[in-house]
């Protein structure tokens, strides 16, 4: 009986630790901590509707992490990495279509004013994702941004 109690206590302790290491949209600070843990700045703020928003930078390029599926500005379900580029010369619609037809991730489009935009959604609902998986998505996002910048500048 004593062994069962010890095993149960260990299981609960492990599950609490594992849960604490999850990156969850319901806990925007967990997203900020994961971003900082990967070596990026994380400026916590709010968007125009009051939902959480994190601003960051990679290699001199600004990006944001928007939170979606929020209930009254809390309990969010998903995040979206976003970067916008206002260049002297707007990329063509053909360039955007070329990107979207060749890239599985990183949806690209032009704003109403002709500025290039790229987004990547990450589902953090139902318990979130591990810090390691978040870092993997972050690395992929940073790579996509660099590739996209080359694409729109070509």
In which residue ranges do the predicted regions lie?
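Short, internal acidic amphipathic alpha-helical interface segments
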Residues: 22, 77-117
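N-terminal secretory signal peptides
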Residues: 21-73
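Sec-dependent N-terminal signal peptides
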Residues: 4-15
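Flexible helix-coil linker/hinge segments at domain or subdomain boundaries
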Residues: 146-154
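Extracytoplasmic/secreted envelope proteins and their assembly/folding machinery
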Residues: 28, 32-35, 93, 135-138, ...
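Sec/Tat signal peptide C-region and signal peptidase I cleavage site
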Residues: 16-20
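A short, solvent-exposed beta-edge/loop patch
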Residues: 105-145
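A mature extracytoplasmic/lumenal domain signature
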Residues: 7-8, 46-48, 58, 67-69, ...
């Amino acid at each position: 009986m004593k062994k069962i109690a010890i095993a149960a206590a260990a299981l609960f302790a492990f599950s609490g630790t594992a849960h604490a290491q999850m990156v969850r949209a319901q806990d925007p600070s967990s997203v900020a901590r994961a971003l900082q843990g990967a070596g990026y700045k994380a400026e916590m703020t709010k968007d125009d509707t009051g939902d959480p928003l994190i601003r960051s930078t990679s290699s001199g390029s600004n990006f944001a992490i928007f939170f979606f599926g929020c209930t009254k500005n809390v309990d969010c379900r998903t995040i979206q990495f976003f970067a916008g580029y206002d260049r002297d010369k707007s990329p063509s619609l053909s360039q955007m279509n070329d990107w979207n037809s060749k890239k599985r991730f990183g949806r690209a489009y032009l704003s109403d004013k002709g500025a290039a935009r790229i987004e990547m959604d990450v589902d953090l609902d139902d318990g979130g994702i591990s810090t390691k998986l978040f870092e993997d998505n972050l690395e992929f996002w940073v790579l996509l941004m660099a590739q996209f910048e080359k694409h729109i500048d070509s």
